[in-house]
């Protein structure tokens, strides 16, 4: 049990917010690739406790290690929509981050839902309190209000540890000693998110070999995925609200993946799954560069007996020279944008017009943009969007 009232033994869903704030909110992400045809998700529907059309070919009963969720009634009453903003304080927000946050906020508010703000600061480069404070100030300036939080991942390590222990106790993990250089040197094919597909070099090491290697360097921890011939479990299918039907064979298109790095930092896939469930998130809106992470997260959700939210990935914003906007390159960062536009209404109105959310670039508040927002519009503009300075 952590300070938020979250328990991760056999389940993670007893969440009680330790504080409720009515400041302002957002979650940055700005990415996008090209994916698939539009889905038919209805606005306002939330997945019930037992996801139905998400894992079409995954036999939950044979691999779920927390069966309470798998046994939940499929006809449970719809739950309130809960969206989230999950920025990483690795630098100043840029325009792509603002776009991601805006879409998440508009989608949730258009369904009468609430927003959770979570600061994803597990990585050392994100442990900069001054950047987290700046990020929160920027979200407040934009007028995107949140209802719970901010919560910080560095305060939630016990939850991730408990989830990892469940996987370990079920025999689903193993120590991996492969270095990043070794993985890239193997010239292995890459997963959809650019990481090398792991071919299982450390999967079947003997106890003696594990002990020998552990004396030399700390291992990472990998999660086993179903074997390629395990057709009942290997293929993950889901429907993305923007890009439609998605399908991934874990063994051949992903491989066993990290749940904890060798430096002890919990992997993004595990932490985000635990947090989304604990916070009751029913809708995840984020950049399309994270579309490839979704099958791994759904696999983890089912192993841990957690609900699967709706997923909606959005286009990436690109610079005129074809580059993806990035914090590192300080592309259209919010400091510059605040100076240039002067007011949040001017910035949001211009962004909404550039991305097709609104019919023009008339200055508008976030609240005024709710009536213009539609996932049909996002689907119609699902290719990368090139933006130019005002």
Regions found by a protein language model. Name each.
Residues 7, 13, 24-26, 32, ...:
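Short hydrophobic targeting helices and cationic amphipathic motifs
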Residues 11, 18, 22-26, 39, ...:
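Low-complexity, intrinsically disordered segments with a bias for serine/threonine
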Residues 17-19, 28, 35, 43, ...:
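Cationic, low-complexity basic patches in intrinsically disordered or flexible, solvent-exposed regions
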Residues 47-91, 110, 115, 211-212, ...:
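Non-catalytic terminal extensions that flank enzyme cores
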Residues 59-191, 288-289, 293-306, 364:
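N-terminal Rossmann-like or analogous alpha/beta NTP/dinucleotide-binding catalytic cores
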Residues 181-326, 333-338, 387-390:
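Active-site cores that bind ATP or allylic diphosphates and position pyrophosphate for catalysis
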């Amino acid at each position: 049990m952590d300070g938020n009232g979250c328990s991760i033994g056999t389940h993670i869903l007893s969440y009680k917010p330790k504080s409720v704030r009515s400041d302002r909110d957002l979650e940055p992400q700005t990415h996008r690739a090209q994916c698939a045809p539009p889905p038919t998700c209805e606005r306002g529907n939330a997945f019930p406790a037992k996801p139905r059309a998400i894992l079409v070919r995954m036999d939950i009963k044979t691999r779920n290690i927390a069966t309470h969720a798998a046994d939940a009634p499929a006809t449970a009453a719809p739950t309130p929509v809960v969206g989230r903003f999950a920025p990483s304080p690795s630098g100043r927000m840029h325009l792509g981050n603002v776009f991601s946050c805006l879409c998440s906020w508009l989608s949730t508010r258009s369904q009468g839902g609430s927003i959770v703000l979570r600061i994803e600061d597990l990585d050392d480069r994100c442990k900069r309190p001054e950047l987290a404070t700046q990020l929160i100030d920027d979200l407040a300036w934009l007028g995107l209000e949140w209802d719970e939080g901010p919560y910080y991942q560095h305060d939630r390590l016990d939850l991730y540890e408990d989830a990892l222990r469940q996987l370990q106790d079920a025999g689903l993990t193993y120590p991996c000693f492969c270095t990043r250089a070794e993985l890239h040197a193997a010239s292995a094919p890459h997963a959809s998110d650019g990481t090398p597909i792991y071919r299982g070099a450390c999967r079947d090491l003997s106890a003696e070999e594990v002990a020998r290697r552990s004396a030399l360097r700390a291992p990472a921890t990998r999660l086993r995925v179903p074997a390629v011939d395990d057709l009942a479990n290997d293929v993950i299918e889901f429907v993305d609200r923007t890009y439609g039907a998605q399908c991934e064979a874990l063994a051949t298109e992903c491989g066993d993946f990290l749940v904890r790095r060798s430096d002890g930092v919990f992997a993004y896939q595990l932490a985000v799954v635990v947090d989304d469930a604990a916070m009751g998130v029913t809708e995840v809106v984020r950049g399309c560069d994270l579309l490839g992470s979704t099958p791994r997260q759904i696999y983890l959700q089912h192993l841990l007996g957690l609900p699967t939210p709706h997923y909606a990935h959005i286009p990436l914003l690109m610079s005129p020279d074809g580059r993806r906007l990035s914090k590192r390159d300080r592309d259209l960062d919010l400091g510059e944008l605040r100076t240039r536009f002067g007011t949040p209404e001017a910035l949001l109105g211009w962004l909404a017009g550039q991305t097709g959310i609104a019919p023009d670039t008339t200055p508008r508040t976030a609240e005024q943009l709710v009536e213009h927002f539609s996932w049909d519009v996002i689907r119609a503009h699902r290719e990368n969007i090139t933006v130019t300075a005002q």
